[in-house]
Amino acid sequence: MKIGIIAYQGSFEEHYLQLKRAFDKWSINGEITPVKIPKDLKDIDGVIIPGGESTTIGLVAKRLGILDELKEKITSGLPVMGTCAGAIMLAKEVSDAKVGKTSQPLIGTMNISIIRNYYGRQRESFETIIDLSKIGKGKANVVFIRAPAITKLWGKAQSLAELNGVTVLAEENNILATTFHPELSDTTSIHEYFLHLVKG
């Protein structure tokens, strides 16, 4: 199994370590590789789009020619997990809590609507407990950093976890989106669930 991690910015190393822990837990002989240009997508079984600044990630990905390639592969069934800014990249509808609708480059393959900076400056970073029973796990302590919120889901997209009634983890077929940072958690539950999607 070969998992790629988009490596423009964001927590590449933290995702790498969480994947290694999940591989070890499941006794998977897996490979993890950074993804920056289209040829890096060759022969991967799944891809992670980490957090960071979604507009920057989108612009760099578009300039390097990987944005359309990612969209095509994800549409064709490549398993993908987008965390925080990565979830924004996957959404079909994006707006900002302050400025409204945005025109940033998106992959746009998931039937969800996201509001950037949903929790505002007062809560730029916080930790809390969420219930992961819908993915067969227990409660988990997770980290939110300038987090967006998934405010609408349609089609086959479904909510897998909520915080105060707002979706923070969603899935649609081969696509997984989290508004928190699972790579900063003390549990590998989310990465394990992603590997479950990759294994099919």
Swiss-Prot record:
Its EC number is 4.3.3.6, 3.5.1.2. InterPro entries: Class_I_gatase-like, PdxT/SNO, PdxT/SNO_CS. L-glutamine binds at G52, E53, S54, R116, I145, R146. It catalyses: aldehydo-D-ribose 5-phosphate + D-glyceraldehyde 3-phosphate + L-glutamine = pyridoxal 5'-phosphate + L-glutamate + phosphate + 3 H2O + H(+); L-glutamine + H2O = L-glutamate + NH4(+). The active site is at C84 (nucleophile), H181 (charge relay system), E183 (charge relay system). It comes from the Archaea. Pathway: Cofactor biosynthesis; pyridoxal 5'-phosphate biosynthesis. PANTHER family: PYRIDOXAL 5'-PHOSPHATE SYNTHASE SUBUNIT SNO (PTHR31559), PYRIDOXAL 5'-PHOSPHATE SYNTHASE SUBUNIT SNO1-RELATED (PTHR31559:SF0). In the presence of PdxS, forms a dodecamer of heterodimers. Only shows activity in the heterodimer. This is Pyridoxal 5'-phosphate synthase subunit PdxT. It comes from Saccharolobus islandicus (strain L.S.2.15 / Lassen #1) (Sulfolobus islandicus). The gene is pdxT.
